Regions:
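A short, polar/proline- and glycine-enriched secondary-structure boundary/capping micro-motif
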Residues: 111-117, 137-142, 194-196, 217-222
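Short, ordered beta-strand-loop transition motifs
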Residues: 94-97, 121-122, 173-181, 236
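N-terminal mature ectodomain segment of secretory-pathway/periplasmic proteins
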Residues: 47-136
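Hydrophobic membrane-insertion alpha-helices, especially the h-region
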Residues: 1-4
Length: 239
């Protein structure tokens, strides 16, 4: 089971890293850095946010690996929290690479019984697969359209973990809403979406909202309002 699962992850990873590998090998490709001058004209809460989280000259994050532990509610109607561990690999749009991520997790359902789960956005396609012990498939959804948009939405909502990905130079377009909120638009190929970012009293992003995100209810995809909350900010690598 583990071997088969690892082979799947290796294939996905090759796809994720492909555009970045081409970029890194390109002759004369400069290392890019954040320039505070690009904040000119941004909505006030967005301007304040970048001044708070970035220093002039900060290297643009091109890729990151995140180790996670936590609990996940396995039911939409009851409290069924299960522990999980995971590794997430992210590639941003830095200097022309294609945005994407792979979340490779193990959820402990019962003692000795784990479910392997992968959630990803690679080369413009979304993927969600789950297999008991990495062998017996219990969920398998892949494709473009709303599936891809939903996974790109996850990528976009998690960008405060690597905030240079939210800069205008990285393809994000900001529009004003009020003193504590702004809308941001991101496009990747045919997939484009706009999310509402809200900023707290300290200037940090505390929520990211979408009017609708697809989620599976039984065998049908249902569009529902969606929100990601953020808190407990810490400094990493100068950000």
């Amino acid at each position: 089971g583990a071997r088969r699962w690892n082979e799947r992850m290796a294939k996905l990873s090759r796809g994720l890293e492909a555009s970045r590998a081409t970029l890194v090998k390109a002759p004369g490709n400069p290392i890019r850095h954040y320039d505070v001058a690009e904040l000119e004209g941004l909505p006030p809460p967005v301007h304040r946010y970048f001044l708070a989280v970035l220093k002039d000259g900060q290297p643009i994050v091109s890729a990151v690996t995140i180790e996670m532990t936590g609990t996940m509610n396995m039911s939409a109607t009851a409290e069924q929290w299960k522990p999980f561990t995971s590794t997430q690999r992210v590639v941003t749009a830095a200097a022309g690479a294609r945005s994407g991520f792979i979340w490779n997790a193990r959820i402990s359902m019962l003692p000795g019984i784990g479910v392997r789960v992968v959630d990803s956005y690679v080369a413009g396609k979304g993927l969600l697969q789950a297999a008991v012990l990495g062998l017996f498939t219990v969920a398998d959804m892949e494709g473009e359209g709303e599936m891809a948009r939903g996974e790109l939405m996850r990528f976009f909502a998690e960008t405060p973990w690597y905030p240079t990905a939210l800069l205008p130079s990285q393809g994000v377009r900001w529009s004003a809403v009020n003193e504590t909120s702004a809308r941001a638009t991101l496009a990747d190929g045919p997939n484009a979406l706009t999310l509402l970012f809200h900023f707290d009293a300290a200037g940090m992003i505390d929520s990211v909202r979408a009017d609708a995100r697809g989620g599976m209810v039984g065998k049908e995809m249902v569009m529902r309002p969606w929100e990601c909350g953020l808190s407990d900010y810490q400094s990493h690598d100068g950000m």
